């Protein structure tokens, strides 16, 4: 039996995320380009992507100077 823990990162600049099997990418302000192994998605504020399953890597690129994205990495821990 296990539980999930979260690490929350606030992003303002482009970055690459190593493969992870669960998490949330949520645009808070502006727009971001989310490039994953299965395609590219453009997300505006209050939009994002949720993953739970097969690990995926991401390349995240802000569109404009004021863009902000939350990356919530969820990972399993034992009790």
Regions found by a protein language model. Give the residues of each.
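Glycine- and acidic-residue-biased ligand/ion/polar-headgroup-sensing regions
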Residues: 1, 19-38, 46
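Conserved short histidine dyad/triad with adjacent acidic residue
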Residues: 1-20
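Generic preference for hydrophobic/aromatic residues in regular secondary structure cores
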Residues: 6-8, 25, 36, 69
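Short acidic-glycine-tyrosine-enriched beta hairpin
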Residues: 13-16, 36-56
